[in-house]
Each structure stands twice: as C-alpha cells, then as structure tokens.
Amino acid sequence: MNAHFTTRAHRLSLILLLVIGVTALAACGPKAPAVTEVQVTLNEYTITMDKTSIPAGPVKFVFNNTGSLTHEAVLEPAGAHDEPFSLDGKESEAEEIEAGQSATLEWTIDTPGDYQLACYTPGHFEQGMFTTFTVTAP
C-alpha cells in the first residue's frame, strides 16, 4: 500500500510539473505589441502632440480640435506635402475634424523614421499647421 501511494504521488508530481512547464512555455510566446496612445491637439495653425517619439507598432492618435475652424489630420513621412502614402496596406487619408470635436485614428507604423501630422485645409499647412515626430525601433 505504501509503495502504491509513493508511485501515485510521483505520478501526480510529474503531472503537476508538466502542467507548470507547459503553462510557463505558453507565457513565453510572442505577445502582441502594446498600442501607443498619442494625444494630438489641433488649433488654428498649430498641431501639438503629447509625445515626439514613439516605438514602432500600433499607434492610436486621439485628435482634439480645440480651434474654431475645421482641421484635417493627415499622417505622412516628414517632408512630404500631401503626397499619397500607403500604411497598413491602405492609403493614409485626411480625416476632417470639426471645431470642438474629437476623432481617433489608428495606424500600425512598422518602419522607424520621421513622420508628420499635417492639416491641408487650404492655407493651413502654409501657415505652419504640421508637426513632426520620430518612430523608433521597437
């Protein structure tokens, strides 16, 4: 009886170790990258961001138009000027944000480099309504 108990205890111990090992290995698998949230304020002829450097990966831009005019939000490589730009397999399009309104746009930016957010409402970009930020390697 004592030998039976010892064998059974060994089996239970081995099963427990196996379960713990499998669980530990599963936890070591690749994790989805965290979404970086960036607060962006649009006002007459200015765009300000709460971050100027973000890691590559998914980004959620939360735009708040505190101005009295409608503004656009366009994401593009720094130095571009309203040129077609593909991101996430789709063209980065302008999002119009009415005065006093907010909008959320999500993109995955995998390529490190310098980017800009710009407003191309007629005359706004020319008055300095753009800002640049850096995407760093994860």
Name the predicted role of every residue range.
Residues 50-74, 103-115, 137:
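Beta-strand cores of secreted/periplasmic/IMS beta-sandwich domains, seen most often
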Residues 74-80:
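Short Gly/aromatic-enriched secondary-structure transition segments
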Residues 83-91:
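Short beta-strand and strand-turn-strand segments in soluble, beta-rich domains
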Residues 29-31:
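Bacterial signal peptide processing site
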Residues 34-58:
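N-terminal edge beta-strand
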Residues 2-15:
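Bacterial N-terminal signal peptides that target proteins for export
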Residues 23-27:
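C-terminal motif of bacterial Sec signal peptides marking the signal peptidase cleavage site
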Residues 46, 95-138:
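Extracellular/periplasmic metallocenter environments
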